[in-house]
């Protein structure tokens, strides 16, 4: 084999140096790409944290652009490192989730399968038990009616001929045919699952039991009479002095004597301080009114004093005059007005305003669940400087806008409500927005889509009662149907002076 010449060695060294220089350049380029990816990912995460509320209210343009930039850089990084980009494979590859076991409380029917033959299929030898494989499948059995027959035996005394018999057990509805479980199903189906009574009647008919809509309506009415003491106890608890969330929504109500409807109102009042570290149970109380006049919330809140967190509805203004109730309004409303303009006419101004409001929400996400004193300290340190800067910015930009423009109106709304809008920064118990009350009204909105209207003002009142109890169950992670079944089974004989013991968070439901 020929010896390698000095020229070949020189050429190889030169090529090696070139390759090392290229590798160094690619490594530097890769490092720059990785740093840019990390920076974009951090900005994207921050922007996502800033944007609260429904998805339609997010600043989606900026998020989409940043995601596109991030994907482009990740593809370039893959090319530099030799990784093959496959859009079907997520980055990083997600591990297979472990299936969550079924709750132990569910009843189980076991099917035990034995080998087809009692002997070995290969040699005919006898078989002995070695072990077993088990698999579970979730099944839904058709809900079944059951008739509970109560037999009270009569016994006669052999000496004095006296007749002895056990007393008849109480029924939720006197001389009624429905047990507490069936009544609870009817109430839950209508007010938690939003199934109108006529549909329930059809469902029960397909199961062979004829229950007319008028009969079901009578049961609902009777249950509301039974549960009315609970509503009073719930109202007293919710109206305890402190901080309260309030909101309202329109409902259609059928006018008597014709097929036309009028617009009534359902008011929601929520006591929920869990975001400020409180261990007290959350609760919601609903009230029905014929219209939206201010006299209704003034009557509802006659015994309340503290902070009322609501929208800027003028009907609340009378409550604030004597100083017993302090106004705190909702940043979500202020943000929504700016966002609506941003959706129609996006601009640097709307984007900047939404970004600054997003920074306020990012602070709230970090302090959610902390004690009120700690939340106040964080807001004093972080939120107040941002609010001061935002106010100055809004006032400065107002000078450049036509006062008739939609954006000027949105900015003016925030500035006109500024003291109430920024009150939360001075009170650790108060929230940045009124979403707690808005969330409580979602059940009403869903029900409104299904049964369209209340049949009367009385129907609106009984709806308010049941929305109160079911909504409070949901706030406390209590199953509404199990709760109503238990309460309807005992309330007829329950002492009136102890009715507060039957509130959703105070009873331990028996195992079913």
Predicted regions and their residues:
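Short, flexible loop/hinge motifs at secondary-structure junctions
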Residues: 1-177, 245-246, 252, 278-280
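Catalytic center-proximal scaffold of phosphoryl-transfer enzymes
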Residues: 2-3, 14, 21, 101, ...
């Amino acid at each position: 084999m020929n010896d390698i010449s000095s020229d070949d060695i020189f050429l190889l060294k030169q090529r090696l140096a070139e390759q090392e220089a290229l590798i160094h350049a690619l490594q530097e380029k890769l490092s720059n790409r990785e740093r840019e990816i990390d920076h974009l990912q951090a900005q994207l995460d921050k922007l996502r944290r800033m944007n609260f509320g429904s998805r339609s209210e997010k600043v989606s343009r900026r998020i989409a652009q940043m995601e596109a930039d991030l994907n482009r850089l990740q593809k370039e990084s893959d090319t530099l490192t030799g990784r093959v980009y496959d859009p079907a494979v997520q980055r990083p590859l997600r591990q297979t989730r472990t299936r969550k076991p079924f709750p132990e409380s569910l009843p189980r029917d076991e099917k035990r399968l034995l080998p087809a033959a009692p002997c070995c299929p290969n040699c005919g030898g006898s078989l002995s038990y070695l072990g077993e494989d088990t698999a579970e499948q979730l099944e839904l059995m058709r809900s079944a009616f059951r008739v509970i027959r109560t037999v009270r035996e009569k016994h006669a005394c052999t000496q004095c001929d006296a007749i002895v018999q056990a007393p008849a057990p109480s029924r939720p509805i006197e001389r009624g045919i429905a047990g507490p479980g069936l009544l609870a199903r009817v109430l839950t189906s209508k007010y938690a699952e939003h199934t109108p009574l006529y549909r329930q009647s059809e469902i029960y008919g397909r199961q062979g039991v004829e229950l007319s809509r008028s009969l079901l309506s009578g049961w609902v009415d009777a249950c509301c009479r039974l549960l009315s003491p609970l509503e009073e106890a719930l109202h007293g608890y919710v109206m305890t002095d402190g901080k309260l969330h309030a909101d309202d929504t329109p409902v259609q109500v059928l006018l008597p004597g014709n097929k036309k409807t009028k617009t009534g109102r359902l008011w929601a009042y929520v006591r929920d301080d869990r975001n400020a570290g409180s261990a007290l149970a959350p609760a919601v109380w609903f009230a029905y009114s014929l219209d939206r006049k201010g006299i209704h919330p003034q009557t509802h809140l006659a015994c309340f004093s503290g902070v009322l967190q609501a929208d800027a509805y003028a009907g609340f203004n009378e409550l604030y005059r004597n100083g017993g109730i302090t106004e705190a309004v909702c940043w979500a409303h202020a943000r929504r007005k700016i966002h609506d303009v941003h959706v129609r006419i996006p601009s640097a101004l709307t984007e900047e305003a939404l970004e600054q409001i997003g920074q306020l929400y990012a602070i709230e996400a970090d302090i959610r669940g902390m004690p009120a004193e700690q939340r106040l300290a964080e807001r004093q340190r972080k939120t107040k400087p941002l609010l001061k800067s935002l106010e100055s910015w809004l006032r400065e930009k107002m000078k450049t806008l036509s006062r008739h423009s939609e954006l000027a109106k949105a900015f003016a709304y925030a500035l006109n409500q500024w003291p109430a809008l920024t009150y939360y920064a001075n009170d650790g118990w108060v929230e940045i927005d009124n979403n707690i009350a808005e969330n409580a009204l979602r059940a009403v909105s869903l029900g409104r889509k299904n049964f369209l209207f209340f049949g009367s003002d009385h129907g609106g009142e009984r709806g308010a009662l049941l929305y109160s109890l079911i909504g409070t169950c949901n706030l406390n992670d209590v199953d509404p149907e199990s709760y109503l079944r238990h309460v309807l089974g005992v309330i007829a004989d329950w002492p009136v002076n102890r009715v507060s013991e039957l509130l959703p968070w105070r009873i331990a439901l028996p195992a079913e």
